[in-house]
Amino acid sequence: MNFLSIDFSTDIGSLFIKIENKTFSKFLQSDKSPNDLLMKQIMDFFKENNLSLDDISGIFINQGPGNFSGLRASLAIAKGLSISKNLKLFGYNSFIWRCANLLNKKDSIYSLIKFRNKYFIKKFNKKLIGDSKIIETSEDEIIMNYDNKFKVVAKNDTKYFDERILKLNNLNLVDLKHKDLEFLKLNGLLDENLIKPLYLS
């Protein structure tokens, strides 16, 4: 599948295009890029790589959790492009993205995210189906209750995590790769209906 992936859930936004066996990526300082310029940045990204929207058949969009304005703007643009260009739209959240390479590998997986100085955790089963609601937790609770649980944290998030958490047992640091989203899609693990931002308090 040829696709565009948009992730503006964090301060560093990213765009990714896969066309056949070629991939193209770009990072943007999303907290310093006006949201009304996002559409232009996407079109410039295609143009820089001699591509057009006609080259893709779908869009993957990060629903969060994360930056409120970034999520809202990127989701609105993704929906607009999907409708105007008749492209399939697939939504994903940051919790399952961290687990993309663990399908059928662990009975229980705890995906950890830190957002606005708060820790959040979501449990998945071996089929990567959410076993629980998103739970807000603390450093001490994670250390006390999840030391022996199999946990995943994105490598680029480690700078935000307390060192005590990063030293816990069974902590798996993962790279977030846009191409893994196609794997999630092929296994029916992306949202296709009611795609909306995932906000955390």
Where does each model-flagged region fall?
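Buried hydrophobic packing segments
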Residues: 42, 77-81, 99
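Short, basic/glycine-rich phosphate-binding loops at helix/coil junctions
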Residues: 20-23, 75-82, 119-120
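N-terminal beta-alpha supersecondary unit
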Residues: 1-63
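Oxyanion-binding and handling regions
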Residues: 1-18, 90-201
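DPxDG-like acidic metal-binding loop motif
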Residues: 58-94
